[in-house]
């Protein structure tokens, strides 16, 4: 698996390589760093690993499924290369994606977060986490990976244009006053950066190796920022008394819930009545005039 990770890095697939590395590290912890031959990977071994993930590592079913899918992909590559016979070791473990309960907070909580400032004993890192949450909400539930990688060139003539990394769908969002105010707040930090927000600005921990790949460094900065934002959002949620775990994903569902509560048409919302596929959602979104979606977003921001 180390060879596969090295190949992914060589091909510039840094994010994917990190997923494979995380899976390998998890499997090594399960094995106490003991090697295992490909021919020894069978259904019993995978059932045992799945049990370890649930009961010892205490990860959720989607996380265990994520690790098992990566192991399965690695195993199938080895089978395709004739390195081991196919024994179907993953036939008895869960490798699907469980539908998770949609998490949202009331509009009052979003308004409460908007009114918070450093006077309310927010640390600078908590304030940035709060701002990331608000910007995700303002931008119709944009994911952190897309938010962090927004470039100044994505903003043109009063509209933000970007491609959603998960689906490759092209989105256009009218730039509202709330968005502009948050962006201007960080302009000093992004003055020499191509990005709108400072999540990928050098954190001072850059490797001394001058030959390090720029894309690899960007991936490192992104994952550090993601972990930092997640940690301080949880702290912020506890500090202001928000029930449940506060994450950026909550911002996405809170936007949809607020939209539904303001009688905005279901077809306008990306959540789209619990559809099971992105394809169905895209069909709905593609049939709507972008101005209708922009008006809906402006209506939502006005209630804060």
Regions found by a protein language model. Give the residues of each.
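Short, charged phosphate-coordinating catalytic segments
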Residues: 76-83, 136-157
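Short, basic (Lys/Arg/His-rich) helix/loop patches that form interaction surfaces
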Residues: 121-124, 221-222, 230-271
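Short, polar N-cap/turn motifs at the start of nucleic acid-interacting alpha helices
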Residues: 153-159, 243-244, 264-283
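Basic, Lys/Arg- and aromatic-enriched nucleic-acid-binding interface segment
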Residues: 92-144
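N-terminal core-binding DNA-recognition domain of tyrosine recombinases/integrases
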Residues: 3-15, 24-101, 116-120
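Conserved tyrosine-mediated DNA breakage-rejoining catalytic core shared by Y-recombinases
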Residues: 149-185, 201-202
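Catalytic-site neighborhood detector that most strongly recognizes the C-terminal catalytic loop/helix
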Residues: 104, 164-168, 273-298
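Active-site/catalytic core of tyrosine-dependent DNA strand-transfer enzymes
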Residues: 110, 176-243
